[in-house]
Amino acid sequence: MKLKDIMSREIACLSAEDTVEKAAQLMKSYNVGSIPVCAQDSVVGIITDRDIALRAIAVGDDGYLQVKKVMTANPVVGTPDMDVDDAVRLMSENQIRRLPIVENNSLVGMVSLGDISVEPKLQEDAETALKNISKPAANRFS
């Protein structure tokens, strides 16, 4: 199965100059946990709800902080013709739950572990990826 068969095609995109408040509002509106950051149609970053919580709110910054200050630049991306198994491996290796899908340098979709897990044939792959992504860091709180 290819990513184009399961990817979400209706996706929001932010500019690096947008605020984290706008990012949070879009996440709420689209009911998602991450939004790609684009310059024209090219993906230059990704911002997640976790980025906002840890890199903005937890350090006392307000909602007017620019997305570029908290986003992950140059995110890992997939392509529409990538096999789902390859995407799961890529997500596992990079410990990411969401993968922007790019074709000819343009954002065309998004795939999450949730998209993969709802496909009956792919549930085991999604479970494996989630286990790998969710491994706790050793002695994180000691």
What are these regions (language model features)?
Residues 1-10, 48-77, 81-92, 112-142:
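Tandem CBS (Bateman) regulatory domains
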Residues 13-31, 78-95, 102:
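The conserved cystathionine-beta-synthase
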Residues 21, 38, 42, 67-68, ...:
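Residue-level detector of alpha-helical recognition elements and their boundaries
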Residues 8, 17, 40-43:
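Low-complexity, intrinsically disordered short peptide segments enriched in small/polar/basic residues
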Residues 6, 22-26, 39-40, 58-61:
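Short hydrophobic/aromatic-rich motifs at helix boundaries and adjacent loops
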Residues 27-30, 35-50, 91, 99-114:
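A glycine-centered beta-loop-beta connector
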